[in-house]
Amino acid sequence: MARYTGPITRKSRRLRVDLVGGDQAFERRPYPPGQHGRARIKESEYLLQLQEKQKARFSYGVMEKQFRRYYEEANRQKGKTGDNLLRLLETRLDNVVYRAGLARTRRQARQLVSHGHFLVNGVKVDVPSYRVSQYDIIDVKEKSLSTLPFQVARETLGERPVPGWLQVLPGRLRILVHQEPERAQIDVPLQEQLIVEYYSK
């Protein structure tokens, strides 16, 4: 599936949010790129909604067509559409690998999943958008444990907090999905209601 592969820092500056996490280039210049980047622009309601949608898309590495499908599914579900949307995004396999601390960024997590390094309930899954469910068990393949990305993951495990809906067993680099996340457990700088308003027009 096509995805954005351009400079993430530029997107972070455009949307005024660190899409990577710990992006020093963004921290030095947290304003839009270009010669008028520091200029104050009057932001319309539509622009705010669009920016929030783009923030979510680029944070999770999802293209527009797929993101709209997530919104439509969230809208069909019971409960708040915004909460449902974030839950669908958070339970992507690549995001779970990132949240568990087995990858430094979501982009790296997506690559690790695509290369077939993970098993879900004993079955190889190489689709980053695969949706995990409550009680799923995610393992790193035995042959992959000795590769550099997972050696680094083992050494750095614990540097980033793991959300309460997940548990990581460090000895085996196993991820346990205890539940689907609630909104309070999703630590992303998003106003999801603006995304709902954007698509509701």
Swiss-Prot record:
BP GO annotations: ribosomal small subunit biogenesis; translation
GO molecular function: rRNA binding; structural constituent of ribosome
Entry keyword annotation includes Cytoplasm: no
UniProt keyword list: Ribonucleoprotein, Ribosomal protein, RNA-binding, rRNA-binding
Highest taxon in the source lineage: Bacteria
Domain S4 RNA-binding: 91-155
One CC-aspect GO term: small ribosomal subunit
PROSITE patterns: RIBOSOMAL_S4, S4
Assembly and binders: Part of the 30S ribosomal subunit. Contacts protein S5. The interaction surface between S4 and S5 is involved in control of translational fidelity.
Membership in a protein family: Belongs to the universal ribosomal protein uS4 family.
Function: One of the primary rRNA binding proteins, it binds directly to 16S rRNA where it nucleates assembly of the body of the 30S subunit.
Protein name, entry field: Small ribosomal subunit protein uS4
Annotated source species: Nocardia farcinica (strain IFM 10152)
Taxonomic lineage of the native organism: Bacteria, Bacillati, Actinomycetota, Actinomycetes, Mycobacteriales
